[in-house]
Amino acid sequence: MAQHTVYFPDAFLTQMREAMPSTLSFDDFLAACQRPLRRSIRVNTLKTSVADFLQLTAPYGWTLTPIPWCEEGFWIERDNEDALPLGSTAEHLSGLFYIQEASSMLPVAALFADGNAPQRVMDVAAAPGSKTTQIAARMNNEGAILANEFSASRVKVLHANISRCGISNVALTHFDGRVFGAAVPEMFDAILLDAPCSGEGVVRKDPDALKNWSPESNQEIAATQRELIDSAFHALRPGGTLVYSTCTLNREENEAVCLWLKETYHDAVEFLPLGDLFPGANKALTEDGFLHVFPQIYDCEGFFVARLRKTQAIPVLPAPKYKVGNFPFSPVKDREAGQIRQAAASVGLNWDENLRLWQRDKELWLFPVGIEALIGKVRFSRLGIKLAETHNKGYRWQHEAVIALASPDNVNAFELTPQEAEEWYRGRDVYPQAAPVADDVLVTFQHQPIGLAKRIGSRLKNSYPRELVRDGKLFTGNA
């Protein structure tokens, strides 16, 4: 693999020499940083099994190497990477996998270690969505996830990834993560804080990542991280699990933040060692049981992961002064909900008791039941999935609901050819050789729902959202 030139400030190298355990080679560290990062993917088990995915992609000649800490994660090598971007493959477009760096799969693995099965989870800094979608898959779309993102511009990307992966149990918020301890005290069974950091571990992906690095900025970032972990710890219920992670390497933003929390709340904080998380985890284990992953250990990004338990309640914070505002939705009455459920089932859309129908004007939404306790405490950017819009002739079913709820075995399902599927993703109407019988057609490819179409004569009218339409070369190789 080709080398690339990484910029290292002298003070950074001095700091790394001090931080690195004596069992590791500093020369190996420098050499690893100069190698481009291996690409990796995570199979979306909400859509397919690992075995079925491997069988589906076997003809492509992809070399898939298992990632030790994530059963559904693989490093990937492809001969035609330049000819067809991974994000333009049919399997990516239909949500069968997520392009995710191997190290970033560690925090969710830690969150669900030892059979942990939380029902209400918060992802404090969620965009672009790799960990939120991984959490949703581990929860099998059950329970509820609050996915927060402070950056307004990244909330849209977060929602797009959640929708593509067919996730229904997520509520999105757009807040500074420091508000949650006061706003929703002791409300979550598990919390992931993948904290904003100095990014020292990502130089293999971005050789200029350290251009603006300084010891002073590390200290400023660490101060924010302490405030974030304090807030998250308050939002965690007693007995709950908190995972703190960063993609940086210095101790100030990693071990020191966790030790500060322990010094602040004493016996209420219990560190849960991660040495048994996966075979070979001990190579990155610190004396406190954290994983401090230098890039040469597993040939991946630099990363840090800590897992802790809140053993007892702590004093609550003053209530926040902001006003949430009126909640513009109302629950749908049982009789009407039954009629809506029946109409949805006729086009292949079904859901279980984890989701409940709500209405806003002519919009119908499905909210995860587990998030209802937070209504009135925080303001949501988006809640659950939009099911339909009502009109005089019935319902206009929404694309995100089709991707999350549709069964490819429904009677109205119609399998497209590769060329027809590519036309669909380009936003064009499809003219199949043998037209389907149903008027509302569940369009599938590779036995995966990819949209809902109206049959007009021999034509399938495209309903693929304009913002998702793809140009350029796609999976058949045609531009």
Curated annotation (Swiss-Prot):
One matching Pfam family: YebU_pre-PUA_dom
Primary residence: cytoplasm
Transmembrane segments: none
Gene3D superfamilies: 3.10.450.720, Vaccinia Virus protein VP39 (3.40.50.150)
GO biological process terms on file: rRNA base methylation
Highest taxon listed in the record's lineage: Bacteria
Annotated GO CC locations: cytoplasm
Catalytic residues of the enzyme: C247 (nucleophile)
Enzyme class: transferase
Keyword Lipid metabolism: no
Protein name, UniProt field: Ribosomal RNA small subunit methyltransferase F
